[in-house]
UniProtKB/Swiss-Prot annotation:
It comes from Danio rerio (Zebrafish). This is E3 ubiquitin-protein ligase RNF25. It is an enzyme of class 2 (transferase). Zn(2+) 2 binds at C142, H144, C187, C190. The gene is rnf25. Belongs to the RNF25 family.
Length: 513
C-alpha cells in the first residue's frame, strides 16, 4: 500500500508541473502509463523548436522497485541513430535509480537532449538535398522541414491542381451537392493541412545544389561489372531477359516484303505456272524462244486433259461427274503437228528478231531457216497426205526467201494452211459423231488415219457450242439421235465458222498468226 501511495504522489507532482501536457492512464494489472510530448527549451519560441518527440513510460505494480519501460513515439527532426541513443541513455539512467522516484528526472533528461539536437536532421523531401548552414528552411506544424523556396514552389503547384479539381467538380453534374469536398494544400510527407505565407516562402533564396562529382571507377567495380555482364549474357541466351522493343514487334506484319513467286511454290497447277512464266520478262531472243516453247507445251497439255475427261464422261453416259486424270494419255495427231509448226515458226521469229546488218547475212539466215522448215514439213508430209489428201504446197517449201518480208509471208501461208488442215480434219470426225450410230464399232473405217485413237474427238473441245458437260456422249446417246452433247435426237448446231474463229483466236494467242 505504501508503494502505491508513493506512485500516486509522484504522478500528482508531475501533473502540477506539466499541467495538461502530461497524460496518465492506469491499466488493468494495476500499473500506470505516463506519456508526455517534449520540445526543446527555446524560451517558448515555437518557431525555433525544430525537433520534438513523445516520451512514454510504462510502470508496473512493483514501481519504484523496478525500472520503468521507456519508449519513444512520433519523433520529428531526429534521425534513427539519434533516437536509438536517446532511448538507451534514458533506460540506463532509469536502471541506476531503482527504488527511488525517477519519472521527473527522465523527462528533464530527454528535454535536454532535444535542446542539444534542435537542428533538423535529414534532407528536404522536395529537392532531396541536405540542410546546410546559412540556408533558409521552414518547419511545418507537423514538424517536417523543407527549404523555404522548395516549399513555396510546391504550394504553387498544389494550388494549380486544386483549381483544376474545383473546375472538374463544378462540371460534374452527378456528384452530391450536399457533400462538399474540402480542398487544401497538405504536407508532402504526412498529408496534414498546412498553414503558410506563399509570398514569404517564394521570396526566400533558393538552396545551393552542389553538383555531384564523377565517381572514380575502381578495379573492384570493374570486376563486379564484368561478372554481372556475364550473367546478363547467360540470361539472354536462355531467354530470361525480356526485350520490350522485340516483344512489341513480335507480331508486326511487314508489308514491304517481296511477294512470293508462285512458280517456286510446290503444289501449284499447270495453269498458274503458265501464267507466272508468261508474266516474266525476257531479256534475249533465246530466252524468248524458250519461254514460248514452254507455253506451247502447257497449252498442248491442257486440251489433252480436257479430251480425256470428255472420254470418261462419254463412257459413263452422264457428263455431270467430275473426271480425274485419265489412265491412258494418248496424244492427238493434230496437236502434235500444231506444236511442231509452232516451234518452227518460233525459230523463224528468232531469226527475224536478230540484227541484220548486210544483205548476205539476211540471205544466209533465211536459207538456214528454210532448210529447217523443209525438214520439219517433210516429216509431216506423209500423215497429212494419207489423212487429208492435201499436202503442203511445194512451191512455198522450195522457194527461198530473199529478205525478211518474204520470210514473214511464208510464215503466214504456213499458218493458214495448218489452220485449214485442222479444220478439214475435224469435219469428218464430227460427221461420224453426228450420225449417232448407237452400236457402231469404235474402230470404224470412218476414223481417218491408222493411228487414230478412240479417245480422240477432234478439235471439238475448242468449240463452246458442243460442250462436253452435257449429258450423253459421242458413243452412247440416250435417244439414238445424232446430237453430240445433247440428250435428244436434234442435229448438232456447232458450225464450222464459229470453230474457225475460235481456232484463229487460239493461234493469235500463241503467236502463230
Amino acid at each position: 500500500m505504501a508503494a502505491e501511495s508513493d506512485v500516486l504522489s509522484e504522478i500528482e507532482v508531475l501533473q502540477s508541473i506539466y499541467l495538461d501536457e502530461l497524460n496518465v492512464t492506469q491499466n488493468d494489472e494495476g500499473g500506470w502509463t505516463v506519456s508526455l510530448v517534449l520540445h526543446p527549451s527555446t524560451a517558448e519560441d515555437c518557431l525555433s523548436q525544430f525537433v520534438r518527440l513523445t516520451l512514454t513510460m510504462d510502470l508496473d505494480s512493483q514501481y519504484p522497485y523496478s525500472s520503468p519501460y521507456i519508449s519513444i513515439h512520433n519523433p520529428r527532426g531526429l534521425s534513427d541513430d539519434k533516437l536509438l541513443s536517446l532511448q538507451k541513455s534514458l533506460q540506463m539512467e532509469a536502471e541506476e535509480c531503482v527504488g527511488t522516484p525517477v519519472l521527473y528526472q527522465l523527462i528533464e533528461r530527454a528535454k535536454e537532449i532535444l535542446t542539444d539536437s534542435n537542428i533538423p536532421h535529414g534532407n528536404c523531401v522536395i529537392c532531396l538535398y541536405d540542410f546546410k548552414e546559412g540556408e533558409v528552411f521552414t518547419k511545418t506544424s507537423c514538424y517536417h522541414y523543407f527549404h523555404s523556396h522548395c516549399l513555396g514552389r510546391y504550394i504553387t503547384h498544389s494550388e494549380m491542381e486544386l483549381k483544376d479539381r474545383e473546375r472538374e467538380l463544378e462540371e460534374d453534374k452527378t456528384r452530391d451537392r450536399t457533400e462538399e469536398e474540402e480542398l487544401a494544400v497538405v504536407c508532402p510527407v504526412c498529408r496534414e493541412s498546412l498553414t503558410y505565407d506563399l509570398d514569404a516562402l517564394l521570396s526566400s533564396p533558393a538552396p545551393v545544389l552542389c553538383q555531384q562529382e564523377d565517381a572514380v571507377i575502381g578495379g573492384e567495380f570493374k570486376k563486379k561489372w564484368e561478372a554481372l555482364q556475364k550473367i546478363l549474357e547467360r540470361q539472354k541466351e536462355k531467354g530470361g531477359v525480356i526485350d520490350p522493343e522485340a516483344e512489341s514487334n513480335r507480331f508486326l506484319i511487314h508489308i514491304n516484303e517481296a511477294p512470293v513467286n508462285l512458280s517456286d511454290t510446290p503444289g501449284m497447277t499447270d495453269s498458274s505456272g503458265a501464267e507466272s512464266s508468261q508474266s516474266l520478262p525476257s531479256s534475249s531472243p533465246d530466252s524468248t524462244s524458250t519461254t514460248q516453247t514452254s507455253q506451247n507445251q502447257h497449252t498442248a497439255g491442257q486440251p489433252q486433259r480436257k479430251h480425256t475427261g470428255d472420254f470418261k464422261r462419254g463412257r459413263r453416259g452422264r457428263g455431270a461427274g467430275r473426271g480425274g486424270p485419265a489412265r491412258h494419255m494418248v496424244p492427238a495427231p493434230g496437236e502434235e503437228r500444231l506444236g511442231k509448226h509452232i516451234q518452227s515458226s518460233d525459230k523463224i521469229n528468232s531469226a527475224n528478231s536478230g540484227p541484220t546488218n548486210t544483205t548476205s547475212q539476211v540471205e544466209s539466215t533465211a536459207q538456214r531457216q528454210a532448210c529447217e522448215l523443209s525438214e520439219n514439213t517433210a516429216q509431216l508430209r506423209q500423215p497429212l497426205t494419207n489423212e487429208e489428201n492435201k499436202p503442203v504446197s511445194q512451191d512455198m517449201l522450195t522457194s527461198e526467201p530473199k529478205d525478211g518480208q518474204e520470210v514473214s509471208q511464208q510464215k503466214e501461208c504456213i499458218s493458214k494452211e495448218v489452220t485449214q488442215t485442222i479444220l478439214q480434219e475435224g469435219h469428218p470426225e464430227r460427221e461420224h459423231v453426228g450420225r449417232g450410230d448407237k452400236r457402231g464399232s469404235r474402230g470404224s473405217a470412218r476414223h481417218h488415219g491408222h493411228w487414230q485413237d478412240r479417245n480422240y474427238k477432234g478439235p471439238g473441245h475448242w468449240d463452246n457450242s458442243g460442250s462436253a458437260g452435257h449429258r450423253g456422249g459421242a458413243y452412247r446417246t440416250r435417244e439414238g439421235g445424232a446430237g453430240r452433247g445433247h440428250r435428244g435426237g436434234g442435229a448438232y448446231r456447232g458450225g464450222g465458222r464459229g470453230m474457225h474463229q475460235r481456232v484463229e483466236k487460239e493461234f493469235r494467242k500463241e503467236g502463230v498468226l
